[in-house]
């Protein structure tokens, strides 16, 4: 967990303690957020490219949601 930022560690603790809801389809959740980020013109092009690249890599991986 040390390699992740403080905000991620905080949310992890909240989910683990039951204070924040757990999402069973974690990959679907990640892809949804990455898609929203990649499409958000308010974000920098660099951030949008990182989100698009990460999402594309997940889609090429074994993840299939049908």
UniProtKB/Swiss-Prot annotation:
Report the Pfam families cross-referenced here: UPF0253
**InterPro entries linked to this entry:** UPF0253
Q: Family per UniProt? A: Belongs to the UPF0253 family.
Q: Which residues form the signal peptide?
A: none
Q: Which gene encodes it?
A: yaeP
Protein name per its UniProtKB record? UPF0253 protein YaeP
> Which positions form S-S bridges?
none
């Amino acid at each position: 967990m040390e390699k992740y930022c403080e905000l991620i560690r905080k949310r992890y603790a909240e989910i683990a303690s039951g204070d924040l809801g757990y999402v069973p389809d974690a990959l679907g959740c990640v892809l949804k957020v990455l898609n929203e980020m990649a499409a958000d013109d308010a974000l920098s092009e660099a951030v949008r490219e990182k989100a698009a690249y990460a999402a594309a890599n997940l889609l090429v991986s074994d993840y299939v949601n049908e």
